[in-house]
Regions:
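Sec/Tat signal peptide C-region and signal peptidase I cleavage site
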Residues: 15-19
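Hydrophobic anchor at the start of a short beta-strand
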Residues: 51
Length: 249
């Protein structure tokens, strides 16, 4: 009887381990916003699908997807997304949602921005790419001032925000990260609602022809659900501290 029971446990455990598995390679901001914890349990196949979210900077997420370490890619850098699709690493792409970037800094130092420290993530993330695009349009290369007023953290949004608040400095952040951030100190939003600060998130289904090790059907099923009208409404309704976080067109 004991042998039969052990065989049954092993059989059941084996089936659980080999359930449909989908890995989402994601930017950190969507994970840190709490969106996945809110959204994914609504997926009709949630209980029978093991969904793993790997949250890293956009650059690393794209590299991971190129290496077939995920069936779905959710990032926010149009230039690198276009290159990913052009090189046939993705089969389809969908404009999932958008929010915006903001510039935060100390409340009492509004008139002295030029003499203060700016903290850059400098981590090849989508936020870092957006920041560098803004600097380029302004005609300034801030890296030539690295170590003086321009500080390159090489870290994620949370640690970079902590550095900014502790040093009384400034940084560019996505709005959702700021809403979730607890250590605001005396910092506030200084610049927002500008067209150049729009932050678009794309979702890409990784090309099965390149990554045949992945469970393509499971990834495709989740991808199709995430781009549905039902999910669009769920995304729009998601809030942090009574503030809308993401929008869908």
């Amino acid at each position: 009887m004991l042998k039969i029971l052990l065989s049954f446990i092993i059989f059941v455990g084996s089936n659980i381990i080999h359930a449909d598995t989908v890995t989402i390679q994601s930017t950190t901001s969507t994970r840190d916003s709490g969106l996945y914890k809110y959204l994914l349990p609504f997926y009709p196949k949630y209980k029978e699908t093991q969904i793993k979210v790997v949250a890293v900077g956009t650059g690393q997420a794209i590299t991971n997807a190129r290496n077939c370490d995920g069936g779905i890619l959710i990032v926010h850098d149009k230039k690198r997304e276009t290159e990913f699709m052009k090189n046939n690493y993705g089969s389809v792409i969908h404009n999932l949602m958008f929010n915006d970037y903001i510039i935060i800094g100390p409340k009492e130092d509004l008139a002295q921005v030029s003499g203060s420290r700016f903290i850059s993530r400098s981590d090849s993330s989508g936020t870092h790419a957006a920041e560098m695009s803004i600097w380029t349009k302004s005609g300034l290369d801030p890296t030539s001032f690295s170590g003086s007023w321009y500080l390159e953290s090489g870290q994620g949004m949370g640690p970079s925000l902590n550095i900014a608040t502790s040093l009384g400095g400034y940084t560019l952040t996505d709005r959702s990260s700021w809403l979730r951030f607890q250590n605001k100190a005396n910092h506030t939003i200084l610049y927002e609602n500008a067209q150049e600060l729009r932050n678009d998130y794309s979702m890409i289904l990784v090309n099965h022809a390149r990554c045949q090790n992945l469970n393509y059907e499971a990834a495709k099923s989740l991808y199709n659900w995430l781009k549905s009208a039902e999910v669009a409404q769920l995304i729009i309704r998601y809030e942090i501290n009574n503030n809308n976080v993401f929008y869908v067109e």
